A protein has these predicted regions:
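Flavin-dependent oxidoreductase catalytic cores
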Residues: 1-335
């Protein structure tokens, strides 16, 4: 367990805020698989202030998800402050997180996301204003720098703490790296030595063993798991159990994966129209199929589906095939 200000996080495993992924349906599933803290996908400050319908729907929080962190992004201090005030007063979020790590050009070109990393003074100013304006804890997720010549992680981390941030999460890659190359865990260790607030490590945590290694090597307070949890909430469960007991639980069976995939879809359909939910679920279902023999053919079929019944039928036939024990010729998949 650790605390972000007065918010108790029951374990040291955090679900990362992934854009286009971390809606209520995915977050609740992650919570049920053991994540101590789940983070909502980033929302635009200006979209909140303009009362954009899609954005306002993204602010929905199921009480079962809590504790939950809701992330906002923006490049202008005044609009960030006003959006944070709205989140503070009108949502069930426990924590307000500031995005300073998104490397996508459409975000950075408006001086938001990781663009803030280039100005440590602005980092201090915006966080101080947010902290002064809301009652909920304010946290920050940042990358270690823009490129190898512009790494201001120590200044930015110190300024975040000095401005009143209650915790900091660090993805230890530069913006230029995007998701390539190896994450530099030494950065997390160095920041942790300097700060008193909780430091959450992020980057290349792809197994329970690596989660423990990050905790041991960097002394960070928690690990943040992102892409490794896509279609694989068992990664969260197995990591929590491994950190608690030192034992690795079994990988899920194909049937278990498909059952949870369909549960995920049903939850999406509770917050979105069926066709929209099914189309969104196509990418998630592809992740659930990863590692299952014959899953490549299913992935292609998924892109033709429009209803829950169609997806359930496809998966049912696939499971019947898998569980029949039929051996197919190499490179030939029969469903």
């Amino acid at each position: 367990m650790f605390k972000i200000r007065e918010i108790e996080i029951p374990n040291r495993v955090v679900l990362a805020p992934m854009a286009g992924v971390c809606n209520a349906a995915f977050r609740l599933t992650a919570k049920e698989f053991g994540a101590g803290l789940v983070c909502a996908e980033m929302v635009s400050d200006k979209a909140i202030l303009f009362n954009n319908k899609k954005t306002m729907n993204m602010l929905y929080i199921d009480p079962r998800e809590r504790p939950l962190s809701l992330q906002i992004f923006g490049g202008e201090i005044e609009t960030l402050v006003e959006a944070a005030k709205y989140v503070d007063k009108n949502t069930e979020a426990d924590i307000i997180d500031l995005n300073m790590g998104c490397p996508v050009p459409k975000i950075t070109k408006v001086d938001a996301g990781s663009k803030l990393l280039l100005d440590p003074d602005k980092v201090y100013e915006v966080i101080a204003r947010l902290v002064d304006s809301v009652s909920k804890p304010v946290t920050v997720k940042m990358r270690m720098g823009w490129d190898d010549e512009h790494i201001y992680i120590m200044d930015n981390a110190r300024n975040a703490e000095r401005a009143g941030a209650s915790a900091i999460a660090i993805h230890c890659r530069t913006i230029v790296q995007m998701y390539s190359g190896k994450a530099n865990w030494d950065v997390i260790r160095d920041v942790k030595k300097e700060l008193k607030i909780p430091v959450i490590g992020n980057g290349d945590v792809t197994s329970p063993e690596l989660a423990k290694k990050m905790l041991d090597d960097t002394n960070c307070d928690a690990v943040m798991i992102g892409r490794a949890a896509l279609g694989n909430p068992w990664m969260l469960y197995r990591t929590v159990k491994y950190l608690e007991t030192g034992e690795l639980t079994d990988e899920p069976t194909p049937r278990e994966k498909i059952d949870v995939c369909l549960l995920h879809l049903r939850r999406l359909m509770e917050i979105k129209p069926e066709k929209v939910a099914v189309h969104e679920m196509r990418k998630h279902a592809s992740y659930y199929m990863k590692g299952i023999k014959g899953g490549a053919k299913v992935k292609k079929e998924l892109n033709t589906l429009n209803t829950y019944a169609e997806m359930e039928h496809l998966f049912g036939e696939f499971l019947d095939f898998l569980e029949s024990g039929i051996v197919t010729p190499k490179k030939e998949i029969i469903i």
